[in-house]
Amino acid sequence: MTITPSLKGFFIGLLSGAVVLGLTFAVLIAISQIDKVQRSL
């Protein structure tokens, strides 16, 4: 039973890391898209 808390924390860390990575990629893509639009104007 001592394994479950560490596993829970591990999964929470993985999830938060994935969310942070996803947000970072979304921001980078948005910035590049905005840059393209501004250059085409």
Swiss-Prot record:
GO BP term, pick one: photosynthesis
Membrane topology type: Single-pass membrane protein
Record's cofactor remark: PSII binds multiple chlorophylls, carotenoids and specific lipids.
Lumenal compartment segments: 2-6
Pfam families documented for this protein: PsbX
Cellular location(s): Cellular thylakoid membrane
Keywords noted in UniProt: Membrane, Photosynthesis, Photosystem II, Thylakoid, Transmembrane, Transmembrane helix
GO CC entries: photosystem II; plasma membrane-derived thylakoid membrane
Residue ranges that the UniProt entry lists as topological domain Cytoplasmic: 30-41
Transmembrane annotation, as ranges: 7-29
Quaternary structure, from the entry: PSII is composed of 1 copy each of membrane proteins PsbA, PsbB, PsbC, PsbD, PsbE, PsbF, PsbH, PsbI, PsbJ, PsbK, PsbL, PsbM, PsbT, PsbX, PsbY, PsbZ, Psb30/Ycf12, peripheral proteins PsbO, CyanoQ (PsbQ), PsbU, PsbV and a large number of cofactors. It forms dimeric complexes. Part of a photosystem II (PSII) assembly intermediate complex PSII-I; crystallized from a strain deleted of psbJ, it forms monomeric PSII before addition of the oxygen evolving complex. PSII-I includes 3 assembly factors not found in mature PSII (Psb27, Psb28 and Psb34).
Protein family membership: Belongs to the PsbX family. Type 1 subfamily.
Function according to Swiss-Prot or TrEMBL: Involved in the binding and/or turnover of quinones at the Q(B) site of photosystem II (PSII). PSII is a light-driven water plastoquinone oxidoreductase, using light energy to abstract electrons from H(2)O, generating a proton gradient subsequently used for ATP formation.
UniProt-recorded name of the protein: Photosystem II reaction center protein X
Naturally occurring in which organism (per UniProt): Thermosynechococcus vestitus (strain NIES-2133 / IAM M-273 / BP-1)
